[in-house]
Amino acid sequence: MKQEKKKFDAEVGKILNLMIHSLYSNKEIFMRELISNASDACDKLRYLSQSEAELVAGDSNFKITVKGDKNNGQVIIRDNGIGMNKEDLIENLGTIARSGTANFLKNLSGDSKKDNMLIGQFGVGFYSSFMVADKVTVTSRKAGEDKVYVWESEGEGEYIVSNSDREFSRGTEIALHIKKEEDSFLDHFRLKHIVKSYSDHIAVPIYFFDEGDNNEIQLNSASALWTRSKSEITEEQYKEFYKSLSYAVDDPWVTMHNKNEGAIEFTNLLFIPSSKTYDLFHPDRKRRVKLYIKRVFISDENIDLIPSYLRFLRGVVDSEDLPLNISRESLQHNNVLEKIKNAITKRVLGELKKKKEDSPDEYNNFWANFGGALKEGLCEATTDHEKLLEVCIFRSALHNKMISLDEYIKGFKEGQNTIYYLSGDNPDKLLSSPQIEGLLSKNIDVLLFTDTVDDFWVNVNSEYKGHAIKSATRSDIDVDQATSSSEEKNKDDKKSDDEYKSLTDYFKEVLGILVKDVKISKKLTSSPACLAVSEAAMDIRMERFLIEQKQIANASAKNLELNPKNKIIEKIFNDLKANNKNNEELVKLIFDQACILEGEPVADTGAFSKRLNDIVQKAIL
């Protein structure tokens, strides 16, 4: 027997150390991981056999067998699925989730409950075996191949791969050499109970080999859970299916089990998690909704089964209308799949709308977890934007709580027709922004946008149900006229501009190219000034994001709005009327302050510091 001793990847030792020291609070979950892997192996071969029937010749009835061997201190899990050759064993068991390993380690929090969720999600579930075993032996023969290989490790930095002369049929056998202190797992009653707990939803028959009777007892119903009537399924069975499918420790927040009959027939069993998934915004994230055709697993990768913005969904979709022999490539642009996707999207958004109305506190928690992903759909051309906006909620500056756009509209002041928002990184900073002080003083609400995606979707959704969605940074906002006619507004604007022309001209003269224009503000009530942009210009935060991403080179010049009721601005104006133009440094300081409040860079930080020091010195001397 030729043996090769190999070292695990560098990070594998860290993972194994976590397994050995019981990262899982519930050690028996190792059985869930191994049964799930065995079921996946059978599903993969079942799919391949549709086009390569010879792979299952003589053994087409898939099964999983669990055996407790007290005499040898072993628990053995055997399947007749796809199996592995030498290369597969090294790739799948010698490394951990390839690209996911570093992310797994990076995401460890030290909180055992949270870290439990990461194990399966990053593909390290097999290694949970080392929580109960001091040695693991894997024997496998790949479908369509003759050679048998053995992988063996004690979980201490290295493993051995060897070929074997053992008579062994297709599939994989995992023998766990149980630690002395964990020998309760060898008890047949406990072992059967554990297997039954984690297997009832598995579509592959699972047998327990009873040494005493020397026969096999089937422990599960071996029918896909989603094919059963909802009345036959307990809440616990739904929960266990979700946890096994998602490698999760939380319970699902929403369970959607539906049979769609008519032009397109399919069944969906979908879950919305109650906790945020670690990889929601990770570029290498995996899809967690599996496609089945007539109970045969097809794929959960590279298929457009659900829109990207609903990627937090977990579950299965089983189609009756797609042909079993369809290639994965043909699924990319398939009419039936597109109709299934549209039906699921409509169903999920309908469920979310109901939850938003019936359970607002629960919905707030859901939104904190997944709202950022959901809003990405507002940037996609194929989305029904109005339906999606109906389930969106945002922070209200006036009421300091999450509200929907429909609730915002219900709170319109008489004559108001515009939805106002302000975007930024921090809701507390936004609340103190000069941009919204005037609106709030008139009890006109402002929605606070703090997700990066907000700056994108508002560019393609300029209105909702006939009401404009407008940034509070726009120059044309007049809080006194926000609920009045545009004709009245234009008259008052002209009067203000004429009255303070000497003031705005003076600021333009001092600031030069640093500003695009200087105007009298119709939205400031206490602050001296603020930056603003014209109706056609890019929002300030959006521009800053594009500069950070090197999509544009430089920031554009902004409008500076002045508050003539502010004491500082009033002093400058009175000085001008007295023919005193000695406030250049103060003008520059006001502009610098406005830039800082908007997160814009100050043109000359040294000069800004000197101006500030000079003014402080004058004040105290």
Curated annotation (Swiss-Prot):
Residues 1-328 are annotated as: A. Residues 486-498 have a biased composition (Basic and acidic residues). SUPFAM superfamilies: ATPase domain of HSP90 chaperone/DNA topoisomerase II/histidine kinase (SSF55874), HSP90 C-terminal domain (SSF110942), Ribosomal protein S5 domain 2-like (SSF54211). Residues 329-544 are annotated as: B. It is found in: Cytoplasm. Its main location: cytoplasm. Residues 479-498 are annotated as: Disordered. One of its GO terms (cellular component) is cytoplasm. Residues 545-621 are annotated as: C. Keywords: ATP-binding, Chaperone, Cytoplasm, Nucleotide-binding, Stress response. PROSITE patterns: HSP90 (PS00298). CDD domains: HATPase_Hsp90-like. GO terms for molecular function: ATP binding; ATP hydrolysis activity; ATP-dependent protein folding chaperone; unfolded protein binding. PANTHER family: HEAT SHOCK PROTEIN 90 FAMILY MEMBER. Homodimer. HAMAP family: HSP90. Belongs to the heat shock protein 90 family. Molecular chaperone. Has ATPase activity. This is Chaperone protein HtpG. It comes from Rickettsia bellii (strain OSU 85-389). The lineage of its organism: Bacteria, Pseudomonadati, Pseudomonadota, Alphaproteobacteria, Rickettsiales.
